[in-house]
Amino acid sequence: KGIAEDIAKAALQSGAPGPTVTFGEGGGVRDKIPLLRITKGPEKEFVWCVVEKADADGVFGDMARAGKITEPGRGFMYSIPVHTGLINVSSTVSSSAHGANMEQIIPALDDLKGGKDWRTNPETNKSNSIKSTFLKNLIGLYCIVPRDFYGDVYDAILDNGAPGVSTNFGVMLDTDSSESDQQQNEEWALVYTSVGPNDVDSLREAVSEKITALGIDRFAFYTLPIPRALTYLGG
């Protein structure tokens, strides 16, 4: 906690349209040590940012450097694909006067130049890409449960081998429910982690068994691909 402002500022300076900062809880290996598991993980800051594909590498690198993500205890950073959406809405309302946009032009130049080295700033001779070892092809496993039960799901994820876990809270609108104030104000938790593709099914089954044993009848799982992630790897 305490570095979200620096990361968000770096995203803005890299051209990202409005990063969002949210708050929740998170934990990792230290939570598996019994003497340290007095309370749930400390409060965490989450910085979310949606950018065009052509800008993703540069923005990712600038955010990672600002947050010093590859240093011990500095958090976990990852990207997920967004297939449809609108960003910079004010600039996309009217039709473009050109036959192609920058998202099409930049990848085309990458192909022509045989890579991304041409993007190097000639004045500083530095590329926007970050020099580090990425974790690749992970899967994000997300579980939605009523907030009262999030601690059990949080523990189950860590107890079954996940390297870390994060939690966000919010109110979910259910179109099939009545309009009672109690249901409208009911808080839910989104508890999630990232693991290798071979571990997704076993982890989901283990957490499902825990949820069933608790008698929870309202919950949901979903997964998202994580093409790359960055954190401290030790050594």
Regions found by a protein language model. Give the residues of each.
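Positively charged, small/polar-rich N-terminal and surface patches that mediate targeting and assembly
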Residues: 1-235
